[in-house]
A protein has these predicted regions:
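Histidine-centered beta-alpha loop that forms part of the nucleotide-sugar donor binding/catalytic region
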Residues: 11, 39, 122
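N-proximal low-complexity "stem/linker" segments adjacent to membrane-targeting elements
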Residues: 1-26
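Conserved acidic residues
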Residues: 4, 32, 84-86, 94, ...
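Acidic donor-binding segment of Leloir-type glycosyltransferases
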Residues: 21-65
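Short, acidic/glycine-rich phosphate-metal binding loop used to engage nucleotide
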Residues: 64-72
Length: 189
């Protein structure tokens, strides 16, 4: 079975990272790991203390610091370079994947052995969303209140030396040979 690094980026989202890790930890399979990278220049003391406690409690948790410096590609490449998994599932601390997706992630990878990059749909919701926001930003909002769905993300990819991130802002992934898109359904978000 393939192993996965759940690679999480965090800065000051203590409540959100706690919720995400409480969700992910019991779902890890053998040889999976959780890798958390924090922004050295923006992390709060509370988040850092929490991460250090987690690292001491779980042998499959790694915590690394790295300066973001407004360079998201470099930040994600450092995350990739610290991962041990064959595949990387990259997620921000304030995101929470669907339980169905995480429960079936290994099977989805095994069913697509030749694929380097998986586009994963994402559900965006905005608290306090107004018509003014929608018009100003040109957003599309569906009947469920999801913004710009399916908002495909390059969230799952094979860890190779060729695959890497480029572009300081609005970073994109390059170096892959094959890709697929998960179904545009809520359970795959």
């Amino acid at each position: 079975m393939v192993n996965i690094t759940y690679a999480i980026t965090v800065c000051n989202e203590l409540e959100e990272i706690t919720k995400l890790l409480n969700f992910l930890q019991p779902k890890l399979k053998e040889n999976d790991e959780i890798l958390i990278q924090y922004d050295e220049d923006g992390v709060t003391r509370e988040v850092l203390d929490y991460l250090n406690i987690l690292k001491s409690l779980h042998s499959n948790h790694k915590v690394v610091g790295f300066p973001l410096n407004n360079d998201f590609a470099n930040f994600k490449n450092n995350l990739k370079n610290n991962a041990d998994g064959i595949f990387i599932f990259q997620i921000d601390a304030d995101e929470l994947p669907n339980e169905y997706l995480i429960d079936n992630l290994h099977q989805l990878i095994d069913s697509n052995k030749e694929v380097d990059l998986f586009f994963v749909p994402r559900i965006n919701t905005v608290d306090g969303l107004t018509e003014e926001h929608i018009n100003k930003w040109g957003w599309n909002v569906n009947e469920k209140g999801w913004v710009n769905f399916p908002d495909l993300q390059t969230r799952l990819y094979r860890r190779t030396s060729e695959i890497e991130w480029e572009g300081k802002v609005h970073e994109r992934i390059k170096g892959y040979n094959t890709l697929t898109i998960f179904p545009l359904q809520e359970e795959f978000c």
